[in-house]
A protein has these predicted regions:
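Conserved small/polar residues in nucleotide/adenosyl-binding loops
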Residues: 196-197
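N-terminal regions that are enriched for targeting/export leaders
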Residues: 23-117, 129-130
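Extended hydrophobic secondary-structure segments that form protein cores and membrane-embedded regions
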Residues: 62-65, 148-153, 179-182
Length: 198
């Protein structure tokens, strides 16, 4: 009997333990941008990097990155919403907030039209920033005129991300020798999933 009481009390404590944790709702309201999922541009608050142990010096870097921030995959992902708001606007069915949203949406559409899936200016800045931080953190690797082999998938936003990264490195050290290539040859190891729908 005593064992049952101990087990029951233990089970109750375990069940109640999560109640003190932060809820998803609280976290979403604290940082609503996180609710964007893959559309949330990663934050720029970077923790300091761990120093190499004594006696060790960087001599090589292998970097595997994903494309920077992009526009939605296709214009249709914007257009259906623009059309919906336009129809409601013409029917005088929008509230003041709806009209404000419609005007903002038209500005977004003006910028985004024709850029479906492309790298955004923010995406370019992100990759330039990664290159800059890498260069500042490991200057020994970039001294002189080392050779850099840069490879990308055939998806344009990925190739443009690679070039933004490499261009920033070249600005920091014009003597770098960078070989760029985006081809089918590297698709198997750079992106093993089907990319034909992009």
């Amino acid at each position: 009997m005593k064992l049952k009481q101990i087990l029951l009390c233990g089970l109750m404590v375990l069940c109640c333990a999560p109640l003190g944790a932060q809820t998803s709702k609280e976290e979403m309201f604290a940082t609503p941008e996180k609710t964007g999922g893959v559309y949330w541009a990663y934050p720029l608050d970077f923790a300091p990097q761990t120093k190499a142990p004594k006696g060790y010096k960087p001599f090589y870097i292998s970097h595997y990155g994903r494309h920077g921030s992009r526009y939605l995959i296709g214009d249709r992902d914007y257009k259906w919403l623009v059309d919906l708001f336009e129809e409601a606007h013409r029917a005088h069915a929008l509230t003041g907030l709806g009209e404000d949203t419609y005007r903002r949406l038209l500005k977004v559409w003006e910028e985004a039209e024709g850029h479906g899936g492309d790298l955004t200016p923010l995406g370019v800045r992100q990759h330039r920033g990664i290159a800059e931080r890498m260069y500042a953190s490991f200057p020994e690797v970039f001294k002189g005129n080392p050779f850099i082999s840069a490879r990308s998938t055939v998806v344009l936003r990925c190739a443009m991300s690679m070039v933004a990264f490499g261009d920033r490195l070249k600005e920091l050290n014009p003597d770098l020798r960078i070989s760029y290539e985006a081809s089918e040859k590297y698709m198997d190891y750079l992106n093993s999933v089907s990319y034909t729908h992009l």
